[in-house]
Amino acid sequence: MLITWLLDVLLLAPPVAAGYPPKPKNLITIESKALPGATITYKEVPKGVCGNVRSYSGYINFPPNSMREAPQDFPVHIYFWYFESQVKPETDPLAIYINGGPGAGSMVGVFVESGPCRMSEDAQSTVLNEHSWNKEANLLYIDQPVQTGFSYDVLTNATFDFKTNILSPEGPDHDPSKDGTLLAGTFGSGDPSKTANTTLNAARHMWNIVQVWSQDFSPYADNRENDKISLWSESYGGRYAPGFMAYFLQQNNRIKAGLLTGSVLHLDTVGIINGCVDLISQQKSNIDFPYNKNTYGIQAIDDAGYDKAMHAYGKRGGCLDQILECHALAKRYDPNAYGHVDEVNYVCERANSYCNTEVDGIYVDGAKRGLFDIAQCHLDPFPSNSFLGYLAKTEVQEALGVPANHTDPSYTVEHVFNVTGDYVRSDRGGHLLDIANLLDARVKVAMVYGDRDFICNWVGAENVSLSVDYKDAKNFRRAGYADVYTDDSGVPKAQVRQHGLFSFTRVYQAGHMMLAYQPQVGYEIFRRAMFNMDIATGTVTDDIEFYSTQGEVNSTHAEPPLPTVPPTCNFWGMAMSCAKNQIEAIQKGEASIVNNIIVSPTQARGECPTPQPTRKSWFYNNEQQSFII
């Protein structure tokens, strides 16, 4: 067995040895008054673990069947990490940040996107993030639904497979000492019946989580002078953010009417970052965007591939027809999206599988380009998953007081959402109606999209924004695109269409995880949305509800993509960043690994795309297009 020792090498033995977290110590327990039976256990995190502000790490714990109006016949332990504002925690608003997936833990938000810290170059410690969102807001990161990230149902010793992200029972068939891609540790049960299985069920859980935390978590609730709550999310968060906040709004109305016991939540802002919101509005863009509708001159699929995908999308019984069939059956037999009707689940899962394979698959399987960045190889090293190795360190687990390993992504959650076909479904009325209802209730909605993302690309998202039928929709659609300035350079970093409380922003030179690519731009957009400013300049604060951007009806700014980044195989992000030959070498113990990076072997020739033809002209003309389907 060949294993090369290098300076500061992390070989295959250390990740295995780091598997079982230490038993948490010095936890504080709060008995919930908001929901009898629920508890909060937490501890203050030492400064330096992530940032230098006061922060608290802990769990909101629900015994079986204790949540209000939520299917939950199993224990739920939801992990949170709360960072106080750097200015005045008592008066600054609260922003909840959740990642998508489904099954993506929110620690990527902490260490890669909006949190107070970034990973150091050697991935062994952290450095301050100068663009942290807690400059003027309290930040709450939540791993949800249960069995995502640090959240768990029942602590279970198991083996995690980095190749597939699948948990398996401990035993001779899953022996980390014989396979370097396996990690023995403590996780949730891996039981797909013990988590939320649809967006709406996750919303039901989340409402209970926020009810308990906002009322009972004393470091936040005591002496609170500002009770505004905002929710920001990305990717699958295009469904989570509007779906959750619309459900909160519905529950608020029921509480006000005396139909439900609970606290009215002061809903302020919904932020959607590169979110997949509505398939009917967005799916076709997954054909157009890589063909000729991106602004970087990249033609990632050829004419034959384009024709094949378009046929699969539009033919009788094709992708669009199957989406519509799923919606019709779900509306009739499972309108409240409990995910318990087999016929609906089957039809919706089938539609999801067909559209993924026959439409998205033309690009995903053929272009060798990034799912999250069309300008990069599919073995995209950015942003790095090195924070996962940091969270596996015993001293970090002790500081956070976590009894479980961090699972990201959670195959269990991803699988059960796929079984119900949740991605194809929409909740009652759809997520477009969720956004409309929130806007009509005077909740701000900010849609923010990096323009190099494929999977939830800005072209489809623009269609979503123009398809939201709310009271002020005509004024939003009439608004033009304005340049977005976020520093003193005089160079615009984005373009925005905004009318009043609703904005759609396209951010240049950014992929799916926009905040990792353009952190300063992302922070400014967040700050301006949260504090009732115009997104373009941050200078308009008066009568913002009547403000409209002026400019061209289409966002046509184009530029060449930045140079590609060479693929980097990261042990902790093996499934997405490593080629087959590298994974095989890790599995056999024949890889050289330095600070979690596989330095040998390199990926096999042909893994990344060779230069492809570009198109001189692309999709927009000078006339307003009709985006409404």
Curated annotation (Swiss-Prot):
InterPro entries: AB_hydrolase_fold, Peptidase_S10. Its main location: secreted. Keywords: Carboxypeptidase, Disulfide bond, Glycoprotein, Hydrolase, Protease, Secreted, Signal. The active site is at 235, 453. Disulfide bonds join 326-355. It catalyses: Release of a C-terminal amino acid with broad specificity. GO terms for biological process: proteolysis. GO terms for cellular component: extracellular region; fungal-type vacuole. Glycans are attached at residues 157, 197, 405, 418, 463, 554. It is found in: Secreted. Pfam families: Peptidase_S10. Gene3D superfamilies: alpha/beta hydrolase (3.40.50.1820). GO terms for molecular function: serine-type carboxypeptidase activity. Substrate binds at residue 456. Belongs to the peptidase S10 family. Involved in degradation of small peptides. This is Carboxypeptidase Y homolog ARB_06361. It comes from Arthroderma benhamiae (strain ATCC MYA-4681 / CBS 112371).
